[in-house]
A protein has these predicted regions:
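Cytosolic, long alpha-helical scaffolding segments
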Residues: 1-309
Length: 309
């Protein structure tokens, strides 16, 4: 099997070999006084860069502190998809990324990410309707799953952009798509974050919102998620016209928000009005980020609209 690696190299490998595995290793040397979250940030950076094996060793014959080890284990469990701790002691830790580059395409990971984000918004609307604090807390937990897929996508893009042959293998057309997908992934993360903010507002206030108002808020949320669906569909289809329609539709969210706020004239409690304003602002941001996704699709597909001379 002959495989292209970039523009200047060919790799010859047995025909049975279906994937390219460049086993890259990195070592993090740790001082006892290093903040555990300093290590976590460095570990995430190495994961993004595509390393398969990451060793974490203490410097100067010291030991890893229990806090350092716990933060690393928590990070691996919650956010680093496909990563296992294969050695763990006070004298050092070794992490291995076991997931294959071709096991899960960028498109498939993004679809899963969007489904979770949409479920978070549906759940937080139900939590508002029922004043269900436990369900709101479940929304907070779901945010880690969105981040896991986001981290995975960034890792895949960083690996693929160094080897253009792999782009099509993970579901991308060309290297230009990598930047677009990176931005789109960030917007999807933000959409999930706004579900978290609504959930936190409910948890902190512990007071129900007027039922009629919640119904109108839910309708606004469903509209915003409809814009998200159209924007994502335009991305998967690489359809310029569909993306343009999603952007136009997103503009209607301002009318829905104003309609809800104008309907609060009978409320006397300013805290209740402020709560509704916070919730509707978060929903509006969902429509705006969905419009941003569609805008990226326009940039990625605009050449489709040009006349061929």
């Amino acid at each position: 099997m002959i495989t292209r690696q970039g523009n200047s190299f060919l790799q010859i490998s047995p025909a049975s070999r279906r994937s390219i595995k460049e086993q890259r290793e990195a070592t993090i040397e740790v001082l006892k006084e290093n903040n555990p979250y300093y290590l976590a940030r460095k570990l995430v950076s190495l994961y993004f860069l595509g390393y398969h094996m990451i060793h974490i060793f203490p410097k100067e014959n010291n030991r890893l502190t229990s806090d350092q080890r716990e933060v690393i284990k928590d990070l691996v469990r919650r956010l680093l998809m496909g990563t296992e701790i294969i050695a763990d002691s006070a004298s050092g830790m070794t992490l291995q990324v076991l997931i294959n580059l071709l096991d899960l395409s960028v498109d498939a990971a993004f679809k899963r990410m969007i489904l979770i984000a949409k479920s978070m918004h549906a759940d937080v609307m139900l939590a508002l309707m029922e004043n269900n604090i436990e369900l709101a807390r479940e929304v907070l937990k779901s945010d880690d799953e969105v981040d896991r897929f986001s981290f995975y996508i960034v890792r895949q893009l960083n690996i693929a952009i160094k080897n253009e042959y792999l782009l099509s293998e993970i579901g991308l057309q060309d290297s230009r798509s990598c930047l677009g997908y990176r931005l789109i992934t960030k917007f999807a993360e933000r959409i999930a974050d706004h579900a978290v903010l609504i959930a936190k507002e409910l948890i902190d206030s512990k007071r129900p919102v007027n039922l009629d108002t919640v119904k109108r808020i839910t309708a606004m949320s469903n509209f915003a998620l409809g814009v998200l669906d159209e924007a994502c569909l335009s991305m998967f289809k690489q359809d310029y016209n569909s993306a343009d329609k999603a952007i136009e539709k997103a503009r209607e969210i301002d009318y829905l928000e104003k309609s809800i706020m104008n309907g609060l004239s009978n409320l006397r409690n300013m805290n209740d009005i402020y709560r509704v304003k916070i919730i509707t602002e978060n929903i509006r941001r969902v429509a705006e980020y969905s419009s941003d996704i569609a805008e990226i699709v326009l940039n990625m597909t605009v050449q489709q609209t040009l006349k061929k001379g």
